[in-house]
Amino acid sequence: MSVDVIDLRNFYSQRLGVVARRLINRGIRAHWPDAQGQRVLGIGYPTPYLGLFREDAERCLALMPAVQGVLKWPTARPTLAALVDERELPLPDSAVDRILLIHALEMSDDPGDLLREVWRVLAPSGRMIAVIPNRRGLWVRTDNTPFGFGRPYSRSQVTQLLRETWFTPVGWTEALYMPPVKRGWVLRSAVVWEFASTTSGFRDACRSSFLSRFAIAFLSAPLPARSSISGAHSDRAGVW
């Protein structure tokens, strides 16, 4: 089940969405400190996150699936976003150096086809990050965020899917330990939740993961015990 692009935009304009974006951005930045001279592509609804790279990257594009819809991005500049068929991306082979998947894999009717297209347009030794809901996480148990829609994954399921689509798992990172509630005190303490969970026993209970032809993927944090994933192709790696 896909989420409409208007609902995605509305989520990220709310306080809970702002906090989620900030926490996920921290994880993305940890793996990709910069994108100087790189060709960066976002698939799904990546625009809240592509701002990390738009100024430094050689080129930065957003492709949004037809079933979801598309919004102009960036709003005050020439558009860099397009509506596409996710099974036939309008790019030549090895066209980009880095790909960010978010609100994409879990929403896809055929995630295998999507990842094969990602592999095709990703340059050898390119990198992918996939943000994926953890099937045992708190965030998939409520429909007040986009992470509660579509098909969530376990670490083993993502590992298998990556291997079937020519990526080899290589590592993972965690994010979104805080519960997905809109209470002010929870939102204000979001960074504390992240820090405490990565330095305590909650590490295995609540986690997310990053994927990289090198792929990097991360899942939204789980309940006890949750997991994340990383993946890599023989010449293109993935982290999750």
Language model: regions and residue ranges:
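Conserved catalytic loop of SAM-dependent methyltransferase domains
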Residues: 170-196, 205-206
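A short glycine-rich, Lys/Arg-flanked "PGG" loop and its adjoining helix->strand segment in the class I
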Residues: 112-127
